[in-house]
Amino acid sequence: QTKSAWLQKLSSLDHEDDDPGTVWNKEARDRDKDRMSPRQAWRAIQAGMPEDVIISSDIGNNCAIGNAYPTFEKGRKYLAPGLFGPCGYGFPSILGAKIGCPDTPVIGFAGDGAFGISMNEMSSCAREEWPAISMVIFRNYQWGAEKRNTTLWFDNNFIGTELDPELSYAKVANACGLKGVTVK
C-alpha cells in the first residue's frame, strides 16, 4: 500500500472500534459525545507541530494510536519508550530533551494512567530556570491496556482499571506553577 493511500485511510478514521465481544469504546463514545477521540486530537496536534519538534510518547493505548500520526520528513525527532513497557517514560524524556536541546521545541504525549506515574516531575520543571515544554495528556479515565486485556480474557469483567474522572491534570499543573489547559 502506498504512503498516500495509507494516509488517506488514516485520515478517515475518527474513533476506535471495539474488539469482538466488547462494547466499551462504543459506550464511551455514546456517553461522552462532546469529546474528541484520540485520533481527532492527534490530527489536530499534528497540524500544529513545528517541523523541527522533538516528540516523545509514553506507553498505552492512546499513544499506540498516536504513533501513526507524526511525520518526520523535515527533521523531527522521536523519543520512543521501546518494547520494555516503561510506563511513565514520556514526561521525563521530554524534560531531558528540552534540557539537552533548549532551543528546540518539544512535545510529549501520555495517557492519564502513564502520566500519573511521572506527574510529580511537574514540581521540578516549574522552576524559573527550566525551559518551557508542552505535554499532552489523553484522558480516557482508565488503565486502557490493562482494561482491554481484562475485558478480552475475563468476559468484560474488569476491576481496578478505572481512573478518577474528576482529577484535573490542568489544575495539578497550575498548582505546580505551570500553565495547564483542558481541551475536550
Residue ranges and their predicted role:
Residues Q1-K9, A64-K184:
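Thiamine diphosphate
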